[in-house]
């Protein structure tokens, strides 16, 4: 499969709509436009034209826009045909384009291939390319703003600034190593230690902001766990603001997980209602309980719901013992509206009434705190786990470099190597140093047509 052959795809989402777009990218598309329309197209002008089949039948009418390289999304020639958004019509337009461009090597695009070409042609760096997919997938205004900040290059600029400063330090170290006869005290003359301290401080700041970006993009997987009839389904409905889960007084009503995404201050939380945990002979309910424990194992946060009107029993103790130690657990005592006296809760617990709405605002804010979200922080750009991992790797190498800078013998070659590794970690974020396997994994997650 040639990376330079022209490609085509329907660029709009599946289904019916007012407008649908067929996008083509590749070299020398002026010839293809001539074949499709029998006339040349003026670059960057919208032409209202009929879209015809090979036998002259009019398939649709719409706008044809030709973008000449390099002034296009991909950096190649791009031809966009904007017609009506019916699936059958768009498939016919795409088929006609592929037929007309067959001898030119025109083929259907792979998922994410248009954006991959934009990256390879240096129209976008890798972090910006990922932001395209994040903008498409954004499920809240905050996530959309964060994705747009990344797409505009805000995150990449911060990474590039740190990379440039590390390169400058490396250059000075290498010069010192290459010309030992000059007897230059590198660490003193070029103030390497304070420079390194400033670098480390700025990188730590970037890591903290990246954590916020990861939370905004990926959210938190929150599992509601507890015995039957403690109010798990009622709490899910209260947080969602809708009757998502069935609520009855019958124990064991919920037998399989119910997942609902909610947003608190723009942060996505994936709330999972689960089957009540108890000993049972019911085969179907037993399957649901086993699935509950699997959900608990993969949770980012567990809300252990308990009924304040019922005293704890051996089953509560069994549940607590089996909860994974590595996962944060918030004890939530429900149905406080049914008590005659004020409830005296435990430390690190919350008292609520899912049906009465008592304590739900406090619960929402507590969820954000446990997620690590800082509402007072600067509005973040979106980040991915791989970005955060790369930043943390760079920080580790700078920490080791700092240790070498403190040594009396000043082992500059080791100092230089740690700077190189820190720089390599940072450039992996923007794609200046990235394996083909990683590129394939990233762009394969895109939708076709983008």
UniProtKB/Swiss-Prot annotation:
Q: What are the GO MF terms of this UniProt record? A: GTP binding; GTPase activity; metal ion binding
GO CC annotations?
Answer: cytosol
Superkingdom field: Bacteria
Q: Which residues bind K(+)?
A: 229, 248, 250, 253
- The UniProt record gives the binding positions of Mg(2+) as 233, 254
Q: Which GO terms describe its biological process?
A: tRNA methylation; tRNA wobble uridine modification
InterPro entries the record matches = G_TrmE, GTP-bd, GTP-bd_TrmE_N, GTPase_MnmE, MnmE_dom2, MnmE_helical, P-loop_NTPase, Small_GTP-bd
Q: What is its EC number?
A: 3.6.-.-
Please report the stretch or stretches of sequence annotated as the TrmE-type G domain: 219-372
- UniProt function note: Exhibits a very high intrinsic GTPase hydrolysis rate. Involved in the addition of a carboxymethylaminomethyl (cmnm) group at the wobble position (U34) of certain tRNAs, forming tRNA-cmnm(5)s(2)U34.
Assembly and partners?
A: Homodimer. Heterotetramer of two MnmE and two MnmG subunits.
The protein's name in its UniProt record? tRNA modification GTPase MnmE
């Amino acid at each position: 499969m040639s990376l330079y052959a022209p490609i085509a795809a329907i660029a709009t989402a599946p289904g019916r709509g007012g407008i649908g777009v067929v996008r083509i990218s590749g070299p020398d598309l002026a010839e293809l436009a001539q074949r499709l329309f029998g006339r040349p197209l003026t670059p960057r002008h919208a032409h209202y034209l009929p879209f015809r089949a090979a036998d002259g039948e009019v398939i649709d009418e719409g706008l044809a826009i030709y973008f000449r390289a390099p002034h296009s999304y991909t950096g190649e020639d791009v031809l966009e045909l904007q017609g009506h958004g019916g699936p059958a019509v768009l498939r016919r337009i795409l088929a006609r384009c592929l037929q007309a461009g067959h001898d030119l090597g025109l083929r259907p695009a792979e998922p994410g291939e248009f954006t991959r070409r934009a990256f390879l042609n240096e129209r976008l760096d890798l972090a910006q390319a990922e932001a395209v997919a994040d903008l498409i997938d954004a499920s809240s205004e905050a996530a959309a703003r964060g994705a747009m900040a990344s797409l505009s290059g805000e995150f990449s600029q911060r990474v590039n600034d740190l990379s440039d400063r590390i390169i400058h330090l490396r250059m000075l170290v290498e010069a010192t190593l290459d010309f030992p006869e000059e007897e230059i005290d590198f660490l003193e003359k070029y103030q390497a230690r304070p420079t390194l301290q400033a670098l480390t401080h700025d990188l730590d700041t970037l890591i903290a902001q990246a954590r916020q970006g990861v939370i905004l993009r990926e959210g938190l997987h929150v599992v509601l766990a507890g015995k039957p009839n403690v109010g798990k389904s009622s709490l899910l409905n209260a947080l969602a603001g809708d009757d998502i889960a069935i609520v009855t007084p019958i124990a064991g009503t919920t037998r399989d997980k119910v997942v609902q995404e909610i947003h608190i201050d723009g942060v996505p939380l994936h709330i999972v209602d689960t089957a009540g945990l108890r000993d049972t002979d019911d085969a179907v309910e037993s399957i649901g309980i086993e699935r509950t424990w699997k959900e608990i194992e993969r949770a980012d946060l567990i809300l252990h719901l308990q009924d304040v009107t019922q005293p704890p029993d051996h089953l509560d103790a069994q549940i607590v013992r089996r909860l994974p130690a590595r996962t944060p657990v918030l004890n939530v005592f429900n149905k406080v509206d049914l008590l005659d006296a004020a409830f005296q809760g435990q430390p690190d617990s919350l008292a609520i009434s899912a049906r009465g709405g008592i304590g739900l605002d406090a619960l929402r804010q507590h969820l954000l705190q446990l997620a690590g979200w800082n509402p007072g922080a600067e509005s973040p750009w979106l980040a991915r786990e791989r970005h955060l991992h790369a930043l943390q790797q760079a920080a580790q190498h700078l920490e080791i470099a700092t240790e070498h800078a403190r040594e009396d013998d000043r082992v500059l070659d080791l100092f230089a190597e740690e700077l190189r590794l820190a720089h390599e970690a940072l450039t992996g974020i923007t794609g200046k140093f990235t394996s083909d396997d990683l590129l394939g994994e990233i762009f394969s997650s895109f939708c076709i047509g983008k």
